[in-house]
Amino acid sequence: MQAPRLCTQPLPLCVAALYQFCPLGDCAALREVLTRVCRLQGVRGTLLLAREGINGTIAGSQPGIDAVLEQIRAIPGCAQLEVKLSSATTMPFHRMKVRIRPEIVTMGQPDIDPLLSAGTYVVPHDWNALIADPATVVIDTRNDFEVAVGTFAGAVDPQTRSFSDFPAWFRAHRDALLDGKTKVAMFCTGGIRCEKSTAFLRAEGVSEVYHLKGGILKYLDDVAPADSLWRGECFVFDQRVAVGHGLAPGTHSQCHACGTPVSPQDLQSAQYEDGVSCPACHATRTDEQRAAYRERHRQEALATAQGRVHVGAVLPVRPASPR
């Protein structure tokens, strides 16, 4: 079988991060429709479908992305689809996947309905005032490896490995978190996790719950660096790895062995070997594993030099694409 060619779409490419909570009917039929239109338009990425809605990130030419978004907005309940657009100089995905899941972002709380009980939206230009209020506790709802790349000044890091760990973390730390605080402000990459986390806190009896509308990506796009309270870069679930203000490409890369974001400082570590290990996973690798990773890296480099995509070159990104 001939290996797929590298992307030949006009540059820069358009990247669309999207989600919508709405009741979906026949997800299997919808998967076929979306797979067909994405392939027809040369669009790649991942779309997740569940009875509660749609979530994903896709990339392609501007006309191609427009066509896919038009198809999604035609789905009943998706007319107000939440979309954040950015650009990329190389295709950030190897293939197109449309998958059916129990949840479009996994929290493991089946009784939570963001359509009925999500918190109050705060637009990016009002966010600084809210999180600077001494009565506000600010919580980063993302996972530990994302927070390590960047977060808001003064935000609480739950140090969770998965979003499904968040409910137990909040219940265990509730009293300390809310001590002397009357407001809770939460944020995530694109807003979808906060739809559920704010609904969860309201179900737990917390009344004043707020979340950043459009997430970190919208904040970085709207707020000037001179006015920003963001520190670092924002991890994204594609091959760009991280973005900064204006959604410009960040300085982080990614370990091909474990998927951990790698900073420029990490690249200088004696434990970093391109395609083989990084400071986060070096101690856990056997000699046999290192040899296998080196061979895979050699094959990937050869394929790239020949203008091909190595079929095994899928980065082991940790949990797939919440936002």
Residue ranges: model-predicted function:
Residues P134:
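Glycine-rich active-site/cofactor-binding loop and its immediate structural neighborhood
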Residues V137-T141:
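Short hydrophobic beta-strand that contains or immediately precedes a catalytic carboxylate
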Residues Q2-A118, R142-V184, I192-R323:
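Rhodanese-like catalytic fold shared by cysteine-dependent sulfurtransferases
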Residues L115, G119-V123, L130-I131:
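A conserved helix-loop-strand patch within extracytoplasmic ligand-binding domains
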Residues V83, P124-H125:
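Short alpha-helical segments and helix-capping/turn motifs at coil-helix boundaries
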